[in-house]
C-alpha cells in the first residue's frame, strides 16, 4: 500500500518536523488501511507549514523512516545501506574494520556528528525520544547483524 508522504509529513514554521501532526496522520493512514502487510511511502519530501511541497534536510529519507517509526511506535526501525552498520573505523580508509553490534543513541549521534557518513546525527532523534531502536543493515549482505542503536548501555 502506497501511503502519501505529502499527506503525512509536515514541518513547522522553523522547518522542524511537526511530530504531533506526523503521529496523527501516520496513525490515521494505518487505521484506515489495516488489511495491508506492507506499506510504502516516499522519503525526504514533506509539506511545510504553509502547505507547500518542501523537503527534510540532510538525511531526509532516513529521517522520514525514523519519524514514521517513532510516530507508530514500531518494534524497530531499519535503515538499509551499503555497509553492515557502524564500524570501528572508517572502512573507506582503514582495511579490516568490523561492525559495532550495539550503540547507545548518544554514541551513534556523536559518531555521526564527527563524520560517520552512514547516518546523519539528527535523523535518529525521533527514535531516541520515542525509545524505538534503529538497526543499520547492509543491502548487499542482508544476513549480517548490522548495528542496533538504542537506549541500552
Model regions and ranges:
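Nucleotide/pyrophosphate-binding catalytic subdomain
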Residues: 1-124
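A conserved active-site cap/scaffold subdomain adjacent to cofactor or substrate pockets
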Residues: 109-153
Amino acid at each position: 500500500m502506497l501511503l502519501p508522504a505529502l499527506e503525512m509529513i509536515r514541518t513547522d514554521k522553523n522547518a522542524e518536523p511537526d511530530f504531533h501532526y506526523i503521529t496523527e496522520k501516520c496513525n490515521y493512514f494505518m487505521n484506515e488501511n489495516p488489511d495491508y502487510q506492507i506499506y510504502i511511502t516516499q522519503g525526504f519530501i514533506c509539506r511545510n507549514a504553509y502547505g507547500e511541497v518542501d523537503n527534510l534536510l540532510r538525511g531526509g529519507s532516513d529521517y522520514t523512516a525514523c519519524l514514521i517509526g517513532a510516530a507508530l511506535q514500531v518494534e524497530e526501525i531499519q535503515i538499509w545501506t551499503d555497509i553492515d552498520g557502524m564500524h570501528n573505523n572508517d572502512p573507506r580508509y582503514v582495511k579490516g574494520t568490523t561492525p559495532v553490534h550495539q550503540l547507545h543513541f548518544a554514541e551513534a549521534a556523536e559518531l555521526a556528528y564527527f563524520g560517520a557518513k552512514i547516518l546523519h546525527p539528527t535523523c535518529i532523534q525521533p527514535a531516541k525520544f520515542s525509545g524505538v531502536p534503529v538497526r543499520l543493515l547492509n543491502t548487499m549482505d542482508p544476513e549480517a547483524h548490522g548495528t542496533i542503536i538504542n537506549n541500552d548501555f
